[in-house]
């Protein structure tokens, strides 16, 4: 074992072992638990950026962990290869998009391999290849014949710069999502997917997706936007709020309006901001809500928390004043960011009201009766006859809906709303670099789908577009053809499909990428699907994830897959952000400098307080941390990182710096720290191995000091297993391993048992880090004399007996100040603990002459003696 940690050699050796052994190629193994782990495939833009590295490292850690659980793990990779950037690059460099795309794929594939990802490359798909898109064309012709795809004149969003049509979702604040150009409306004939026919199912089956972040499901619900309900305005109480106005809520249960006992607003709601102005406690809670998590924590399952404000709003029918609460279960981007809370008939409101002692007023007679005692019963949410509702008593849901609507309309405080926001998906694009639409236009037969035996309609790959509309429309050799029905001269469709179509089904093709008898091999598809864990950015919450769910249902209805949903669990990783630096130009613009070219000065808390450009030594402005981007020139090249430190350091930093669903702030010192930690692990292992490997550990013969070391080992296993396996909190799992390393570095190594214990400790470190830093762990495992490769080892099991403590160290406080420590048997009673604390020599000094009023014992932690 080399004395120094040499990442380059270690990583090359591990990768070459995995390649030669085909370690990550999988096949269907009936009877073995499967795990399909998928990260969103990249667009081959030229080279990987840190966002890619983060995404694929998270996926890889999960895949490798699941393999250590004994599962048959599929982790494939491919290329979302059609799209606008290839055309733009082609125009700029006068090169065919195909050539540019394939060169980028080759380079990026090598980059992905250098990260050491456990990918089955035998399943690679490239969406711009005819053997992939022919099946997309086949499905198109099937759906066209069934009427699920149709052609009509549509008013479209026309991007005058990109010369193409954009979907509604691709228009942000009236501008094109890619070009930033102001969008025009135009009428042209287009093909549409009838996604509205699936709107109800797309909405309803969201409820089955327990493993999805609530935020994403909410965004999809809002996008589909089915709402049969009422918008109700609660007038401000001027005395407490200080001005006139209304708080709007949208409710699907206006029949329960008379049971509203408080209102709850999201942390970002204007009333929350107002209430927090002179209330530091509330401001702190709001900050906590904003930090926390709709990203990963499922709102439905997290603990409901809230704080009261001094604000009141008026009940729109009774005028009664209702308190305004700020609550973590109300989302700003759902509805109006406020809810009228009816605890008797809504489970979340019920939980909240019960916790905070708010009134619960039943106003609907349900199958559970007229009362709503705790605990919550599903029956409380039923429709039924109104009670305790004054003039509305006795009305059913429909009757109450109508009567309450009339009353609210009279006051100008409410109206009914029912709608779907979702529109059919227009997929025609006047672009070249996309999948050709398989339709032939015949003067006598109309629009004729291309017959299956004539598929694929191949896109010519040697075209260099010039930016003015579609080159295909100027290529008679492409569009001139004969009608498959009548044989007359006809014209091929020259529009191509929206590139979101390719990414809507790629996950299914991975199950049988080389199958040539259909879109998927149903047997293989049903073996692997649905995907167990999908990982990608929150920016795909609506578009891609909605379209993929839609396509999965289309494939199901074609008999290709049997499941209803494509992705069982979804993890949306946060952005990678970094400091920005600039100088303001004379024209008011900004010249951005890469952090690598800037010398910074930091204060004691490591905050940047000054910056100079290395080349001229003159100051630059500090722009704050922003998402890494070309426009702000604050990207860090992953390749430079891997070359300098190795992939394991890169991976360790990515996983340690932040939980996966939060933003990750780039930090050179953090990368240095990750590198230092791996060198520490290597040093300890080297010293241990050089002394010769020890014999077996005799657990029964351990002394107290050795028991404490072994307890640290198994505590790390226990914590890391929960963190990685249940919560994807890789950062805290790594912290556990760091804590364990501190113990192992100080542990004695004199005796044979000491060394056997260190062997168990180092094996544990290697196993716990194996999914995160696979190369160094591959090498350590061999050096520690273990048979086989660590990728085939089992995740370590906790020995609960090792966690049992014979004695505990408790701190003793006098009037809240630390005054001593006591050691007591773990089985000691409260009285024995109290006696030991009172008798502590230092404690006696501080209680002398005082009367002890009470003794507070926090089991396992501390004793506080209150004396005066």
Curated annotation (Swiss-Prot):
<dbReference type="GO" id="GO:0004823">
    <property type="term" value="F:leucine-tRNA ligase activity"/>
</dbReference>
<dbReference type="Pfam" id="PF09334">
    <property type="entry name" value="tRNA-synt_1g"/>
</dbReference>
<dbReference type="InterPro" id="IPR002302">
    <property type="entry name" value="Leu-tRNA-ligase"/>
</dbReference>
<dbReference type="InterPro" id="IPR009080">
    <property type="entry name" value="tRNAsynth_Ia_anticodon-bd"/>
</dbReference>
<dbReference type="GO" id="GO:0005829">
    <property type="term" value="C:cytosol"/>
</dbReference>
<dbReference type="InterPro" id="IPR015413">
    <property type="entry name" value="Methionyl/Leucyl_tRNA_Synth"/>
</dbReference>
<dbReference type="InterPro" id="IPR002300">
    <property type="entry name" value="aa-tRNA-synth_Ia"/>
</dbReference>
<dbReference type="GO" id="GO:0002161">
    <property type="term" value="F:aminoacyl-tRNA deacylase activity"/>
</dbReference>
<feature type="short sequence motif" description="'KMSKS' region">
    <location>
        <begin position="627"/>
        <end position="631"/>
    </location>
</feature>
<protein>
    <recommendedName>
        <fullName>Leucine--tRNA ligase</fullName>
        <ecNumber>6.1.1.4</ecNumber>
    </recommendedName>
</protein>
<keyword id="KW-0963">Cytoplasm</keyword>
<comment type="similarity">
    <text>Belongs to the class-I aminoacyl-tRNA synthetase family.</text>
</comment>
<keyword id="KW-0030">Aminoacyl-tRNA synthetase</keyword>
<keyword id="KW-0067">ATP-binding</keyword>
<dbReference type="GO" id="GO:0005524">
    <property type="term" value="F:ATP binding"/>
</dbReference>
<dbReference type="GO" id="GO:0006429">
    <property type="term" value="P:leucyl-tRNA aminoacylation"/>
</dbReference>
<dbReference type="Pfam" id="PF00133">
    <property type="entry name" value="tRNA-synt_1"/>
</dbReference>
<dbReference type="Pfam" id="PF08264">
    <property type="entry name" value="Anticodon_1"/>
</dbReference>
<feature type="binding site">
    <location>
        <position position="630"/>
    </location>
    <ligand>
        <name>ATP</name>
    </ligand>
</feature>
<dbReference type="InterPro" id="IPR013155">
    <property type="entry name" value="M/V/L/I-tRNA-synth_anticd-bd"/>
</dbReference>
<dbReference type="InterPro" id="IPR001412">
    <property type="entry name" value="aa-tRNA-synth_I_CS"/>
</dbReference>
<keyword id="KW-0648">Protein biosynthesis</keyword>
<keyword id="KW-0547">Nucleotide-binding</keyword>
<dbReference type="Pfam" id="PF13603">
    <property type="entry name" value="tRNA-synt_1_2"/>
</dbReference>
<dbReference type="InterPro" id="IPR014729">
    <property type="entry name" value="Rossmann-like_a/b/a_fold"/>
</dbReference>
<feature type="short sequence motif" description="'HIGH' region">
    <location>
        <begin position="42"/>
        <end position="52"/>
    </location>
</feature>
<dbReference type="InterPro" id="IPR009008">
    <property type="entry name" value="Val/Leu/Ile-tRNA-synth_edit"/>
</dbReference>
<keyword id="KW-0436">Ligase</keyword>
<dbReference type="InterPro" id="IPR025709">
    <property type="entry name" value="Leu_tRNA-synth_edit"/>
</dbReference>
């Amino acid at each position: 074992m080399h004395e120094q940690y040499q990442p380059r050699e270690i990583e090359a050796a591990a990768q070459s072992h995995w390649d030669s052994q085909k370690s990550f190629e999988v096949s269907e193994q009936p009877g073995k638990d499967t795990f399909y782990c998928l990260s969103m495939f990249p667009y081959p833009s030229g080279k990987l950026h840190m966002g890619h590295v983060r995404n694929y490292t998270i996926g890889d850690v999960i895949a490798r962990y699941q393999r250590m659980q004994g599962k048959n793990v599929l982790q494939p990779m491919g290329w979302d290869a059609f799209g606008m950037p290839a055309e733009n690059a082609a125009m700029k460099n006068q090169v065919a998009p195909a050539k540019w795309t394939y060169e980028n794929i080759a380079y990026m594939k090598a980059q992905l391999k250098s990260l050491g990802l456990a990918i089955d490359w035998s399943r690679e798909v490239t969406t711009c290849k005819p053997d992939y898109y022919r099946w997309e064309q086949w499905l198109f012709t099937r759906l066209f014949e069934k009427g699920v795809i149709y052609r009509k004149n549509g008013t479209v969003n026309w991007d005058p710069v990109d010369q193409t049509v954009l979907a509604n979702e691709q228009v942000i604040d009236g501008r094109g999502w890619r070009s930033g150009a102001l969008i025009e409306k135009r009428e042209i004939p287009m093909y549409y997917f009838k996604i509205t026919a699936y709107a109800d199912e797309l909405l309803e089956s969201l409820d089955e997706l327990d493993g999805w972040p609530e935020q994403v499901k909410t965004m999809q619900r809002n996008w589909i936007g089915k709402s049969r309900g009422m918008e109700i305005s609660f007038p401000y109480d001027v005395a407490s709020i200080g001005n006139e106005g209304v708080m709007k809520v949208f409710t699907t249960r206006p029949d329960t309006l008379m049971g509203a006992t408080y209102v709850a607003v999201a942390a970002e709601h204007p009333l929350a901001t107002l209430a927090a102005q002179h209330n530091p406690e509330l401001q702190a809670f709001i900050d906590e809500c904003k930090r926390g998590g709709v990203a990963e924590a499922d709102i439905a399952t997290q603990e409901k928390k809230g704080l009261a404000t001094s604000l009141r709003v008026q009940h729109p029918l009774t005028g009664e004043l209702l308190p305004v609460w700020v609550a973590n279960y109300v989302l700003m981007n759902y509805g109006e960011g406020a809810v009228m809370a009816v605890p008797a008939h809504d489970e979340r409101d019920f939980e909240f009201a019960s916790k905070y002692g708010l009134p619960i007023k039943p106003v609907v007679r349900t199958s559970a009766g007229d009362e709503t005692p705790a605990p919550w019963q599903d029956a409380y949410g039923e429709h039924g006859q109104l009670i305790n509702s004054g003039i509305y008593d006795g009305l059913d849901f429909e009757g109450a809906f109508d009567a309450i609507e009339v009353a609210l309309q009279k006051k100008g405080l409410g109206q009914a709303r029912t709608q779907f926001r979702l529109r059919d998906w227009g997929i025609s694009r006047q672009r070249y670099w996309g999948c050709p639409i398989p339709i032939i236009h015949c003067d006598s037969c109309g629009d004729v789908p291309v017959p299956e035996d004539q598929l694929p309609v191949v896109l010519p790959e040697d075209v260099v577009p010039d930016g003015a509309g579609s080159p295909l429309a100027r290529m008679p050799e492409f569009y001139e053809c004969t009608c498959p029905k009548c044989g007359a001269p006809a014209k091929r469709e020259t529009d191509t499909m929206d590139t979101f179509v390719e990414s809507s089904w790629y996950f299914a093709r991975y199950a049988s990428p080389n199958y040539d008898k259909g879109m998927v091999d149903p047997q293989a598809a049903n073996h692997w699907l649905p995907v167990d864990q999908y990982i990608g950015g929150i920016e795909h919450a609506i578009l891609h994830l909605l379209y993929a769910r839609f396509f999965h249902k289309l494939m199901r209805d074609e008999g290709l897959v049997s499941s209803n949903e494509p992705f069982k669990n979804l993890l949306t990783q946060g952005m990678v952000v970094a400091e920005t630096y600039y100088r303001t130009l004379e024209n008011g613009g900004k010249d951005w400098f890469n952090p690598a070219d800037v010398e910074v000065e930091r204060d004691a808390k490591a905050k940047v307080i000054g910056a100079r450009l290395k080349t001229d030594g003159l100051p630059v402005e500090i722009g704050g941390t922003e998402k890494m981007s070309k426009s702000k020139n604050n990207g860090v090249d992953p390749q430079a990182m891997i070359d300098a430190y190795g992939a394991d350091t890169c991976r360790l930093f990515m996983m340690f710096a932040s939980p996966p669903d939060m933003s990750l702030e780039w930090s050179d010192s953090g990368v240095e720290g990750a590198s230092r930690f791996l060198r520490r692990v290597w040093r300890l292992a080297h010293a241990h191995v050089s002394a010769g490997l020890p014999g077996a550990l005799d657990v029964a013969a351990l002394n107290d000091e050795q028991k404490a070391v072994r307890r640290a080992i198994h505590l790390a296993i226990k914590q890391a297993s929960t963190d990685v396996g249940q919560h994807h909190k890789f950062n805290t799992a790594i912290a556990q391993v760091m804590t364990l390393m501190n113990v192992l570095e100080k542990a004695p190594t004199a005796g044979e048992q000491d060394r056997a214990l260190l062997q168990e400790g180092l094996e544990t470190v290697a196993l716990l880090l194996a999914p995160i830093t696979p190369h160094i762990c591959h090498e350590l495992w061999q050096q520690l004399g273990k048979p086989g490769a660590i990728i085939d080892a089992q995740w370590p099991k906790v020995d609960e007996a090792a966690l049992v403590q014979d004695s505990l160290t408790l701190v003793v406080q006098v009037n809240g100040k630390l005054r001593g420590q006591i050691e007591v048997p773990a089985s000691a009673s409260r009285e024995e603990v109290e006696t030991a604390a009172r008798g502590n020599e230092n404690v006696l000094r501080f209680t002398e002459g005082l009367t002890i009023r009470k003794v507070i014992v926090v089991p396992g932690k501390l004793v506080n003696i209150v004396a005066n």
